[in-house]
Amino acid sequence: MQPKDYMSSSHANWENIQIDSFTSWINQHLSERGLSVKDLSVDFQDGVLLLNLLEILSGKKIARYVRSPKFLQHKIDNIMIAFNFMEKAFDIKVFGCNAKDIVDGNLKQTMGVIFLLIQKIKVNLHLDHLQEQQGETTGTTTTITSTNTTTTPTKPRFYRASMQVNAANRFSHISPNKDQSSSTVATTTTTSTSVVQPQPQPTTATPTTTTATTLTPPVASQQPVSTAPATVTPSTVIPTVTPLNTTTTTTTATSTSTNVPTATTNVPPTATTTTTGTRISPTTGVSVSTIRSKFLFEGGTGNTTGGNEKYNTYSPGSGNTSGVVGPSTSSSLNISSERVLKRTESGYLISGGLSLSGSGSGGIHEPLQRTVSLIEIKLNDHQSKFYDLKKIIFMQSVIRGYLVRSKWRNVLEKYKQHLNEYKKHFMNNKKAYRGLIRVQAIVKGKIQRKKLFKMFPLYRRNEIVKEILSTEDKYVTSLAMVTTHYLKPSEAFLSTQQVRSIFSQIEIIHRYNSLILEKLVSRNKIWYSSGQKIGDIFIEMSAFLKVYTIYVNNYNNSIQTITECMEIPKFASLLEKNRNQFGLDLSAFLIAPIQRIPRYILLLQDLLKNTKESHPDHQDLSLALKKMKDVAEYVNEKKREAENLNQVLTIQSSLTGKFNNLAEPHRRYVKKGTLISNDKIHLYFLFNDLLVKTENKIVSKIRDSARLSNNNSSDKNSKSTFHSPKEIINEGKSKYLNSYFLAGSSLVDSNPDGFTFQIIGVGDANELNSQINNQINNQNNNQNNNQNNNLNNNNDDSPILSFSPFSSSFASTITNSLSSIGNSNNVNNNNNTSSNSGFVNSSNNNINIVNSNGSSPLTNSGHGLNSSFGISSNNNNNLTMPTTSIQLEALSLNEKMTWMGELDECIFQLLEKSKSKKRSLITDADELTTVPFDISVVKDSEFSNVLEKKHSEISWRSKKFYLKNTHLYYHRYSSTESPKEPTKIKCINLILCSVKLAQVVDHPHCFQLITPSRIYFFSCEDSTVLFQWISLIRLSIKKKLESLKDENNNINNFTSIASATSPTSSSSNTTPIVVPIASHSNATGSLSASLGSSFLNQQQRSLEQQQHLNTSNSNLTPLALSSQVLYHINNFISTSTSTSASQSQSQSPSPSPSHSINQKQKIRKLSFYQSRSNTLININNDEDRLNSFPTSTLSVSCLLNNDNHGNNDFDGKSFTNNIDITTTTTTNDDNNNNTTTTQVKKGKDLSCSKELNCSISHDDNSKGSSGYGNNSCGDNINNDESNNNCAECGASDPSWVSINYGVVVCLDCSSIHKNLPEGNVKSVRSLSVAFSDIVKKQEGNIKANNKYEKNIPSGLTKPNPKDSYEIKLSWIKAKYINNNNNNNNSQNGDSTTPTPTPTSTTIHVNNDSTPTSPNLNSQSSPPPTATTTQTENVKLDNGRSSPTPTPTQTENNNNNVLTPTTTTTNTTTSTTTGSRPTTPTILNNEEEHIQGINLKDSTDTSNGKGTWSRGSSHAITERKTSFLDKPRVPVKKEHQGYLFKTSSPTSNNSSDWKKYLFVYKNDVLTYYKVSKKNKRKEKGIIDLFHSVKQESRPKQKYSFTLVTSQRLYFLASETEEEMKIWLDVLSSHTTH
């Protein structure tokens, strides 16, 4: 160690001085064994270095200790062994020091043990010094006598003899006291400022003595050791320094006699030297060297400076000492020389040595060292001899080697002797020789097997690959054999259906597996050069293996069909012939595809097991195995679904009586069994949404036998002796009695110990059927009466309603029936009563019949209907879903719990299905926020009870729960004896929760509450409370979901247009036409928007007007395509003809003079231009295309009546019906023009008639775009010749269409399109009229390819059908994704795109003998003065800027153009506020400019009542979008940092927030747990998050919530800046 200067201007750090001093002292001793200490607290933990130090100090060997401790107990044992050794060898008893503390690295304890060793050695040195002083002669002589010096033998002590040399100097600076001013006991230092050079004194020695060694006792800080010959030579004075700032010198006098060097360490007391007075480091002093360099020898005689340098080397430092070397006087000491000898294995060595260091001015000097090459051997008590140390060491090594070899030589000789004996034995005994050879073979074989075992996985892997290849070859061969020798020959004598039933998809399977075999064979040829990979082939082909689904589902039918076809002789002979040829039956070949996929899984599992993780194929094999398992699960799931459907069909075939269709696509069979109802046992079939009640004769007989057993037995539970349900229901057929719909129902267990339970709120199908049939019969009777009285020429029979509430055809059936009987709802039988019209919603095979005011009598999801039921009639009788409660009794308690569990699961699934439909209506705020607790919850809660909540895996805690407003509050439960106010009340938002039964071992009555963030388990006291909680929670969730109304739920509703006849003209009745029209959201349910509303009588209009005044106008609902356009037409006709006329008639008793019979015919013409994206509406002039409405269908409703006198009386007083509707459909296809006209007339021939002509013509450039005709959208796509091949690879007969890109692709490419951003594909066969928007984008593959393939890189070539998946993927990505933006820009900037030919729809309103149309301004319109033809131009604007209308010259009595509002003139429109009719503004010589309805800007003038009012703006209300609808976008930012995460955000315990490292990259947020060594361990991945909300938490101020589709993540940052960064990064993801 380099010495350190610890002194500074202030006091030194005493602790560091002690540590360094102790370390230096320990290292000086441990260096003998090549050991060292760097840190006392660490290096002494295992006790090994401490034991080595004790061995060096004591010179003894410690027998047993653990030299390489690895366990804690081993280290403690080493420390305890060291303590015991210190007590025995050094007599040091350690108190207050624990071995465990030293093992734990306690520095103070370790330094205490070292200090005890140092102090013990210092004390022993002092005692030795005192004993040696007592053995000296009384007189001190300065000469050395010639006689041998006799010494008094002393008892050897347990410390090193080397410690005698300057021991005081060595330990003086390691004092436990900080005050170093006092010197050690018996320490004498000579301090002087002058140089003393004593004169040498001659001594004589006897011839018999060679040398005499004299040891002086330790005096002061020096332990002089002197060996003097007969003659005295000048001594060498070497300065040394004590720990104090005083100057001390040590003079070494060396005398030689016969050129034999002697080691002298004796310093006379008078010999002193002086130093320059510079400060010297306290660590500078005399230290102990190794065993083999104990003493510094001087050779030769005379002065030291001229002595033998071989034995005397001097290496001073940079400074110079002021000591002067001169002769010294050595004193004769009578001390025995045994103290300086240390016994070793080879003899006595002189122990001790000097290593001096001095200092110069301003620096630290290197130590003064002298080498030792001689050693003195004590021959006897009086003689000793010096030997060369190197020679001694060499001799020792030779001797030791000889001893070791001699030891082992005997062993080897004995071993060779035994071998010779064994050899003779085996050579003479052949049996033993054979046994020896056998043993050797076993041992060698075991060794070789171990080597082979290491190479076995690779060998086994190659064998598995060969097995895959061979089995695939055999499998494809068998499929080809079935196709060639069974399928094709059987087509000659079997029907197509029979062939399809037997062989199913075996040809397609053969084609795909042939492709797999081809890839496997090609890979096997380049097996070693390809990296021995096979997993990628199965990954690529796994998606195509789903074709096995149809085959697996059809297998049972295939076997049954084979049995049936065996009656055909040709087929039987074919099977017999092939059986004899191939040795296998047809069924053996057909079972092969069923077994192939499981075989794939087994082979891949074995292959993955024998593949190392470092192998390049390991990852692909893992993925291939996963995909293969997914395929197997998919096939099995489809198999279960098919079997379930077959089970439903079987059950339906086993039922007798009148019942409806049970085999619905959504219906699944669950359970069947016997239950007791009304003291009768019945057979019940449970489906996922339906409970069917039947009667079985076998069951009845068993019931009778059960009664007898009950009478003979006193046991109340004797019913449990019934036969199992399977034994009962497998025989005979059952009679259908009733069925119950489970949607919205609840279970009640009023008797937990009994066998009975109740189902409340179930829908009764029989009651519903009877109500609907009664209602329909009444309507049919009324319709028949009306038709007999007023429609004598109409011989059409009234339709009879025949429906099935179970089938999807129920909606269409009841819709058509209601359309046919619409008249009967609105007939006025001379009672001056007006009717209401019903609105029917028919979409997605569902029906919604509501009242005219928009209310729904009942909501029920039963029998395949997911909407409300209700029909409004004159008597206000609503058709509602009848509900009832049924009480059932099981045959045993176990069977009861089984039934209740299955029923609860079905109800739970139905509620989840309805919740999923409302999911998009739930906002983030409703989902994340909870209602704060109010004390009123405790008093006014819907339900409250004490439940046990699961706190951990083994502990449950009682809590008091309150249910209110879709929130569940709970707090700690306090007993009734000591009631307390509730504290720490928590809340659970139930809006997205699910509740269902749960099975817990030690808690029998449990249910689980599933929230987005966690799952709660609750335990009830009995089953009654259990099902009560489940029912109430579900009811609360259901009410909340029903309160979420979608503003688009009334789109495409059907209304039955009602009209009332005049009280004075009872014989004049009208026949309304049912048309699709949008319903209104206002509370009055006004029908004035429809065309028929203009003919309501005065009382009805007054009633509606009064209701309108009491209610506020609401915005119109966004309409569907067809409904929106029709709404504009009807509203326009109603406004321009009927409403104002009715108003005028009601305010003026006499008809207007403008209603002249002699006026010429007036024609109103409305034209609709429909293109691929919009529809243009024009009035009078086809070229004025002023408004566009997106629509694809058109339906027109009109009802016009004239009185007998030829006057138009639009207020409904007198009408005569004559309707002429002509519908013309024109198809323009290049040069072909096809027109279809349909004309319908009803009523009598009158002198005055009104004609409504509707002609519809549309462009047929894009086939199927309009949606008309019998052909579906899929047929129209197939008719395009460019779609005969795949747009990507050119494969023939593509069957999939890409919705986003409008191309028709094959099955292989459809899987790639499906994975594109926003990719969506549909099967061409599944397309119908509902997918007309898809067809509009489909322009044909040739046009689409020309558009998308413009910017594809030149390096890519178009793939062919045989190319790999990767080639097709790269082509499709380059075609659509990389150039998507360029294509969009080019489309937006292309102004030369030709406008498609529009579809024109024209409505002609012809008034044959009508003078003019009614005047809209009844208050201020002047009477007409002339009767001339007038052409009125009316424009419907959509809020966009339009050119100023061109004035048209008109000739009329008043020359006025009727217009309610205008935006192109400076004239303001006058409006009447508060009244339904509005007075329009009369503009002279200007065309009528009417703005559109339901427009997107503030100029909308519709008030939803069929009138026009300026300022009544109705902005379009768009559908609420859920955060689930947000698409995934490419990542824009990357970020990482530490965040806190918790699952209990409301907790006040800060330890619940755990710190993780979050890394956001590629739209994925991954969080890791980082160890102290900075190693990451992945804890989870957060993907598909859609919104971020910042809100503070109790223990985290800067916290925010991350919303995903599965759960909520509560995160927090340390600073506000970090939180803002995270919010910006995550928000950039959610906004896209």
From Swiss-Prot:
Gene Ontology biological process terms, A to Z: aggregation involved in sorocarp development; intracellular signal transduction; sorocarp development
Annotated Arf-GAP domain residues: 1271-1389
InterPro entries xref list: ARFGAP/RecO, ArfGAP_dom, ArfGAP_dom_sf, CH_dom, CH_dom_sf, DBL_dom_sf, DH_dom, FYVE_RhoGEF_PH
SUPFAM superfamilies found in the cross-reference section: ArfGap/RecO-like zinc finger (SSF57863), Calponin-homology domain, CH-domain (SSF47576), DBL homology domain (DH-domain) (SSF48065), PH domain-like (SSF50729)
Protein localization: Membrane; Cytoplasmic vesicle, Phagosome membrane
Membrane topology category: Peripheral membrane protein
Entry keyword set: Cytoplasmic vesicle, GTPase activation, Membrane, Metal-binding, Repeat, Zinc, Zinc-finger
Superkingdom of the organism of origin: Eukaryota
CDD domains named in the record: PH (cd00821), RhoGEF (cd00160)
Low complexity composition-biased segments: 137-154, 180-284, 775-795, 1138-1156, 1380-1402, 1409-1431, 1441-1481
PH domain mapped to chain residues: 940-1038, 1532-1631
GO molecular function: GTPase activator activity; guanyl-nucleotide exchange factor activity; phosphatidylinositol-3,4,5-trisphosphate binding; small GTPase binding; zinc ion binding
Domain Calponin-homology (CH) residue range list: 16-122
All residue ranges annotated as the DH domain in the record: 460-638
Zinc finger (C4-type): 1286-1309
Ranges of biased composition (kind: Polar residues): 1500-1515
Domain IQ: 388-417, 432-461
GO cellular component: cell cortex; cytoplasm; cytoskeleton; early phagosome; membrane; phagocytic vesicle membrane
Phenotype on disruption: Cells display defective streaming during development under different conditions and a delay in developmental timing.
Physiological role: GTPase-activating protein for Rac involved in streaming and development.
Domain notes: The membrane association is mediated by the calponin-homology (CH) domain.
PANTHER family (alphabetical): DH DOMAIN-CONTAINING PROTEIN-RELATED, FACIOGENITAL DYSPLASIA PROTEIN
Protein name listed in UniProt: Guanine exchange factor for Rac 30
Organism: Dictyostelium discoideum
Gene: gxcDD
